[in-house]
Amino acid sequence: MKKDLPYLRFLNLARALEEMPKFPALDAVESGILNACSIAWYQDRKLATMEALEAMPEISQRTKHSRLKILADKGMIKVESDEYDARVKYVVPTALALKYYETLGKYLVKSQAT
């Protein structure tokens, strides 16, 4: 296979990111949920947990709910209560999640440069 395909270089670098000890290993569902959440965060939108659970409709609600908890346990997200209504919870990125996406971005740029 050709070695000069930027996307394949990026995938190779992204796989290396998964093996770094400073970032937790994410399975496909966790990664998908985190990526779906990141789109809302990029748009500076508050993401309610119920909205986060709407991502990946092919996955059961129970699985997505447990994966949100796992992402929190892994330090990639945190859940914060609304300041006016404690029943409403928001999914927010942690510093680790922001560093994860920053590193992925650097790898994307690097894959295009070589």
Stretches with model-predicted labels:
Residues 7-36:
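Short alpha-helical segments that sit at the start of domains
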Residues 58-73:
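Short amphipathic alpha-helical interaction segments
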